[in-house]
From Swiss-Prot:
Binding site for (6S)-5,6,7,8-tetrahydrofolate: S111, L112, L113, P114
Cystine crosslinks: none
InterPro entries: Fmt, Formyl_trans_C, Formyl_transf_N, Formyl_transf_N_sf, Formyl_transferase-like_C_sf, Met-tRNA-FMT_C, Met-tRNA-FMT_N
GO molecular function, one term: methionyl-tRNA formyltransferase activity
Enzyme class: transferase
Keyword Ion transport carried by entry: no
BP GO annotations: conversion of methionyl-tRNA to N-formyl-methionyl-tRNA
Family statement drawn from the similarity comment of this UniProt entry: Belongs to the Fmt family.
Gene3D superfamilies to which the protein is assigned, alphabetical: 3.40.50.12230
Protein name: Methionyl-tRNA formyltransferase
Domain of life: Bacteria
Name of the gene this protein is made from: fmt
Catalytically driven reaction(s): L-methionyl-tRNA(fMet) + (6R)-10-formyltetrahydrofolate = N-formyl-L-methionyl-tRNA(fMet) + (6S)-5,6,7,8-tetrahydrofolate + H(+)
Length: 308
């Protein structure tokens, strides 16, 4: 008889789901996470957040380099799991693995599928100015986030959210949805439903996706700033100095796109439509600072100098 869960996950987003399964007494047969990766200037190996939790809780752990490794697949089969739960694992599972668990491989995806299929649904929902997003549990098939839907939960996005804070919220709501999903599957009261409605995509962000185009509206730039924090961060150039724009707010008014119209105690910049007040900014190689701190160390000419 199949029993127990294999958990696939890697970053901080997956931690609440694993902890929720542990705290309610689920039998975790194995935790699968990505190999340790070099990080930072020293390129020191850093363990994924899920590995840290697994080690703290004394859970069996595996970090395969390849998904199609015969020994790894044999190990999974020998565990005879009831479920595999997949939360931001970061690799595509091959068909041989998808067929192992009794109830299939259940994925938690951070959007209301079929909207925002792909690797960066939280970021793109913010960049596109969505007011509502959510989480979906689904049965993984061989496509990219194309499998049948089990459950969904909506949450609203507010103007204070960025990709970091929204990820935290969705990870908690998602953990609750994972528990609800496995409970209902055990009772046989969920019918997987094919995805219907408009399909949109959320590809992995690249560094260049953060480049600010001041010919966009203030609201559009504001959304870009929120959606790209903490990585890759929205950025622009001032007198050939590259700066990251960390937090902003939209104001009414008009000025030429990119033109700095206030630079005494605050930093206000023109856009194609509306004005943008920069609240937090990060010069290259420096810490995040307030606009006032940034201004105090520079000579900026109001009405003459521009971001580009």
């Amino acid at each position: 008889m199949s029993s127990g869960i294999i958990f696939f996950g890697t970053p901080e987003f997956a931690v609440p789901s694993l902890k929720a399964l542990i705290s309610r007494g689920e039998k975790i047969l194995l935790v699968v996470t990505q190999p340790d990766k070099p990080k930072g200037r020293g390129k020191n190996l850093q363990a994924p957040e899920i590995k840290k939790v697994a080690l703290q809780c004394g859970l069996p752990l595996c970090q395969p380099e390849k998904m199609k490794d015969d020994n790894f697949i044999k190990k999974l089969k020998s565990l005879n799991p009831e479920f595999a739960i997949v939360v931001a694992y970061g690799k595509i599972l091959p068909k041989e693995i998808l067929e192992i668990p009794k109830h299939g491989c259940i994925n938690l995806h951070a959007s209301l599928l079929p909207k925002y299929r792909g690797a960066a649904p939280i970021q793109w929902a913010l960049i596109n100015g969505e007011k509502i997003t959510g989480v979906t549990t689904m049965i993984i098939d061989e496509g990219l986030d194309t499998g049948p839907i089990l459950l969904q939960k909506e949450i609203s996005i507010n103007d204070e959210d960025n990709a970091e804070t929204l990820s935290e919220k969705l990870s908690v709501v998602g953990a609750e949805l994972i528990i609800e999903t496995i409970d209902k599957m055990r009772k046989g009261i969920i019918t997987p439903k094919p995805q219907t409605g408009e399909i949109t995509y959320a590809p992995q962000l690249k560094k260049d996706d953060g480049k600010i185009n001041w010919n966009n509206s203030a609201r559009k730039i504001f959304n870009l700033v929120r959606g790209t924090y903490p990585w890759p961060c929205a950025y622009s150039f001032l007198k050939d100095e590259r700066v990251k724009i960390i937090k902003t707010e939209v104001l009414e008014g008009n000025a030429a796109p990119g033109l700095i119209i206030k630079a005494k105690n605050e930093l206000i910049v023109g856009t194609q439509e509306g004005l943008l007040r920069i609240l937090l900014i990060q010069p290259e190689g420096k810490k995040i600072m307030t606009a006032k701190e940034f201004i105090s160390g520079r000579k900026i000419n109001e009405g003459m100098d521009s971001f580009s």
